[in-house]
Amino acid sequence: MAKDQLQVLNALDVAKTQLYHFTAIVIAGMGFFTDAYDLFCISLVTKLLGRIYYFHEGAPKPGILPSGISAAVNGVAFIGTLSGQLFFGWLGDKLGRKKVYGMTLMLMVICSIACGLSFGKTANGVIATLCFFRFWLGFGIGGDYPLSATIMSEYANKKTRGAFIAAVFAMQGFGILAGGIVALIVSAGFKNAYPAPTYSAHGKDSTPPEADYVWRIIVMIGALPALLTYYWRMKMPETARYTALVAKNTVKAAADMSKVLNVEIEEDKATVEKIEENGNSFGLFSKEFLRRHGLHLLGTTSTWFLLDIAFYSQNLFQKDIFSKIGWIPPPETMNALDEVFRIARAQTLIALCSTVPGYWFTVAFIDKMGRFAIQLMGSFFMTVFMFALAIPYDHWTKKENRIGFVIMYSLTFFFANFGPNATTFVVPAEIFPARLRSTCHGISAAAGKAGAIVGAFGFLYAAQSTDPKKVDAGYPTGIGVKNALIVLGCVNFLGMLSTLLVPESKGKSLEEMSKENEGEEENYGTETKGENAQTVPV
């Protein structure tokens, strides 16, 4: 138990796992289900958008999105997410977690539907409308990151807190999987209802007019899970840690948690007064914050930034990589709906076999192995498998070796999710003071989305062939897939090194990790090494 801890917070820390824990996981997790669905489903339909809106009569290949437009469609939601993480992270500390939580969800619901209703007289007009609503969709999604993580960390007990926060994040895997399954069902249904020839046989006829409904339906379905959880989000009480430590209303915090835990909680007035007298109140831009948490914030931001460069590059452009190794046939040999079906099938298999299991391995082991060990291990194996793909890349492009490529590629996803993709979400929700927790998580997550933007825009160009004859229309020559994968391997290695800045929070209360109740004059530098300090001397 942390020094002079409030009874209500201690009650939460030692509470047995019970129904309200799982209720909180589902309520917060469905937001992440929607987040992942909305952010990743666009990669399933970008080739279809190109066929519908950028078809050129007589061209040897189907239409594709021009380079700048493709980058915008893929990247604009990330820019919105980054903005939302910073804004709602800050707002969650100012107004409270609960008050802001409903705003983010309604924004996600409204904008998911609006994306599917994108309109315009020209192709560019439709895409511009889509990008506008995807920005605001991302803005709402961004708010869900710091708020969901903070709420779950502040509700959880210290013994299984890591598993609970990771379980919320693991719903992202189901969101990615659901995006693929929905795309499979919708494209298969339309493909059977509206048969079409291949592009090489009949050009424009390979994209039936009804294909315009396919991408809209896929995009709009993302609103349903969020809409279903709105009522329950509004019924959740404010977290006790915000009410007691930030709003300074220990009586209300005790009353709220008495109902949740079904136990009587009474605060000792002397303890409350002592905490209020001895507690710290430094701000985000103070020297005291820099001294206590500066390296922690550097660690959480740098690891998340580097991870997302690689993670989102792989996720958003796996369809292009699979095409280049021949796992998905050339586009001219398929019709539009068949192409959506095959891309969705490939991404669903990857999600089912590696992405989803990786998340839940983290849930199972995070409170046994610890955050640091999982993050270091995951970063190490991501580096190993990425170089194993990149260096003998020509070997993997041969037809007889394609299955091996897919297996190796899947393993990089597995160790991303049984590794830094999960732990970078968990740790910032545990190591900062309550009054700055949501803000610092938002800053860390925004650094991650900055990495995603680098990946989404950079990899799109970098992976283009070095041979001008093999470059996609409208793109400059790049460094090729092989060299792009080598760069991602180097990024993973840097992520492994930056993990050394992240402290271990396994088995400790949030107040113990953040030194919430220690005065600003106390000697912060005398803490013991090991689990109570940095994972390594820095």
Curated annotation (Swiss-Prot):
Gene: PT3
Species of the source: Petunia hybrida (Petunia)
Cytoplasm in keyword set: no
InterPro entries: MFS_dom (IPR020846), MFS_sugar_transport-like (IPR005828), MFS_trans_sf (IPR036259), Phos_permease (IPR004738)
CDD domains assigned to the protein according to its UniProt record, in alphabetical order: MFS_PhT
Known catalytic reactions: phosphate(in) + H(+)(in) = phosphate(out) + H(+)(out)
Positions with biased composition (Basic and acidic residues): 506-517
Top-rank taxon: Eukaryota
Name of the featured protein: Low affinity inorganic phosphate transporter 3
Segments in the Cytoplasmic topological domain: 1-24, 92-99, 144-164, 233-292, 367-371, 424-442, 505-538
Function: Low-affinity transporter for external inorganic phosphate (Pi) probably involved in the acquisition of phosphate released by arbuscular mycorrhizal (AM) fungi during AM symbiosis.
Family, per entry: Belongs to the major facilitator superfamily. Phosphate:H(+) symporter (TC 2.A.1.9) family.
